[in-house]
Design a protein with these regions (language model features):
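Short beta-edge/loop segments at beta->alpha junctions of small alpha/beta modules
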Residues: 1-78, 171, 175-178, 186
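Short coil/loop linkers at secondary-structure junctions
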Residues: 16, 30, 87-88, 204
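Short gly/ser-rich loop at a beta-strand->alpha-helix junction or flexible surface loop bordering the NTP-binding
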Residues: 44-127
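Hydrophobic alpha-helical interaction segments
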Residues: 129-243
Length: 243
């Protein structure tokens, strides 16, 4: 099969990012032959090697690549909020939640250079994302509400100021949906962080929906905590990722 026909078949299958196994099925050749076949196109820059066994068309969108590196993965946190035009600044790193590996990858395609942070989390917390079809492929990306909840789950990976701005300046956030996702995370600390964030931003009327064991007082003063409480607050606000 020549290159043009191979690309047409990839696009028909919406596989702008594909595996060696995918290519083998398309050209119907043995694995060793398929590997050599793809190597020729990589050398001529008609394909991009993402990592061992994963390839992409040069025209692939970065987001398509980010969610095709490992199965059951999706873009989240600031990159998701940027995708929905909830924040204006594109983040340097793209956070991708998955159930397999934690790893950093630097990707270079004709469109530019990007860094992906694959973050492994438990499978029960891989929810709240959707498939969005592109012209020739697709991406998996968190809803705005789940992107915020994921940021509360691992706050070291996302500055709180961006989350505050998203909640204050956007009409694209469904607060009840946000709370439902937070409850579904089954993380007490996520709920406390959300409650404190609501208190700070004066988002009221939702305490009864947050399934936390203890309600944080609205007048909770962080500047007057005791030394004994400091460790616990570090745990709550993200100096620790214990959940």
């Amino acid at each position: 099969m020549n290159y043009n026909n191979f690309v047409l078949e990839l696009k028909r299958l919406k596989l702008t990012v594909f595996s060696l196994n995918d290519a083998q099925r398309i050209i119907n050749k043995k694995r060793a032959y398929t590997s050599v076949y793809l190597s020729r196109f990589i050398k001529s820059k008609r394909l991009v090697l993402i990592k061992k066994g994963i390839y992409a068309l040069p025209s692939s969108l970065f987001e398509e690549i980010a969610t095709s590196i490992v199965e059951s993965s999706y873009i989240t946190m600031l990159s998701a909020l940027y995708h929905y035009s909830i924040i204006d600044q594109q983040p340097n790193d793209t956070i991708v939640f998955n159930s397999s590996i934690s790893r950093k990858l630097d990707i270079r395609i004709p469109d530019g250079a990007y860094r992906i942070k694959l973050v492994k989390i438990t499978p029960k917390r891989l929810f709240g994302f959707e498939r969005i079809d592109t012209q020739n492929g697709y991406i998996y990306i968190a809803t705005p509400e789940k992107a915020i909840v994921d940021a509360l789950y691992l706050p070291k990976l996302c500055a709180q100021s961006y989350i505050e701005d998203a909640l204050l300046d956007s009409d694209k956030i469904d607060i009840k949906k946000l709370i439902n996702f937070a409850n579904a995370m089954e993380s007490h600390v996520v709920l406390i962080r959300l409650q404190l964030l609501f208190n700070k931003l004066n988002i009221t009327g939702y305490d009864k929906f947050i399934k936390v064991k203890r309600i944080i007082p609205k007048k909770f003063n962080l500047s007057k905590i005791t030394t004994k409480k400091e460790t616990k607050l570090n745990y709550i606000f993200g100096d620790s990722d214990i959940r």
